[in-house]
From Swiss-Prot:
Membrane topology label: Lipid-anchor; GPI-anchor
Propeptide segment residues: 196-219
Subcellular location: Cell membrane
Known role: Involved in disease resistance. Required for resistance conferred by multiple R genes recognizing different bacterial and oomycete pathogen isolates like avirulent P.syringae or H.parasitica (downy mildew). Required for the establishment of hypersensitive response (HR) and systemic acquired resistance (SAR) after infection with the bacterial pathogen P.syringae DC3000 carrying avrRpt2. Required for resistance to the soilborne fungus V.longisporum. Interaction with RIN4 is required for the activation of the R gene RPS2 and RPS2-mediated resistance.
Protein's UniProt name: Protein NDR1
Binding partners and assembly: Interacts with RIN4 (via C-terminus).
Superkingdom of the organism of origin: Eukaryota
Secretion signal span: 1-38
GO BP terms: defense response to bacterium; defense response to fungus; defense response to other organism; plant-type hypersensitive response
Organism: Arabidopsis thaliana
Length: 219
């Protein structure tokens, strides 16, 4: 009888230990997921100016495009290492009816850099020389024109003393330019991700949690 009671008590203790372990592992996993979760940088077009499209006759032969792109790090405690940031500037091919093909007019590369947590990086640049004939073909009857800016890079997140693997970031946005060659929208234009951009928030934390659970399981 005593042996049966001891077996029952031992079984209860074992169940209690298992439940306690599962609860602790779950809380630890949740804490790590919240701590290691990384948000991708948010990019926007703040300035965009093509002098050749302005009203000044002396600027007709100007073959430059001036811009400023801003990248915001929304993470409170994670820095971001950027590889070279590649920018492609395009316009819509208006020589064909119902055509939406993009015609590249220039490109620019921002050298790799580091961005601290909750910091904003303003990257000014000038693209030259532009093909003014291609640029002028983009002008609509009302004097405005629409261009496309695509951004592509890879980033790594700095978490305490270590860095994550690289994650691809591909975003872009259309920019309307008025009759003065200046970005028509006064506020910054948010650049949205393309379909090929890596889903950072889902894959990175999940992989960490899976490794953690395997570690606990084999102990």
């Amino acid at each position: 009888m005593n042996n049966q009671n001891e077996d029952t008590e031992g079984g209860r203790n074992c169940c209690t230990c298992c439940l306690s372990f599962i609860f602790t592992a779950g809380l630890t996993s949740l804490f790590l997921w919240l701590s290691l979760r990384a948000d991708k940088p948010k990019c926007s077009i703040q300035n965009f100016f093509i002098p050749a499209l302005g009203k000044d006759p002396n600027s007709r032969d100007n073959t430059t495009l001036n811009f400023m792109v801003r990248c915001d790090n929304p993470n409170k405690d994670k820095g971001i290492y950027y590889d070279d940031v590649h920018l492609n500037f395009s316009t819509i091919n208006t020589t064909k009816i119902n055509s939406s093909a993009l015609v590249l007019v220039g490109n620019y590369t921002v050298p790799k850099f580091y961005q601290g947590h909750k910091k904003k990086a303003k990257k000014w640049g000038q693209v030259k020389p532009l093909n003014n004939q291609t640029v002028l073909r983009a002008v609509l009857p009302n004097g405005s024109a629409v261009f496309r800016l695509d951004l592509k890079t890879q980033v790594r997140f700095k978490i305490v003393f270590w860095k994550t693997k690289r994650y691809g970031v591909e975003v872009g946005a259309d920019v309307e330019v008025n009759g003065d060659g200046v970005k028509a929208q006064k506020k910054g234009i948010k650049m949205k991700k393309s379909d090929s951009s890596f889903p950072l928030r889902s894959s990175f934390p999940i992989s960490v949690l899976m490794n953690l659970l395997v570690f606990f399981a084999i102990r």
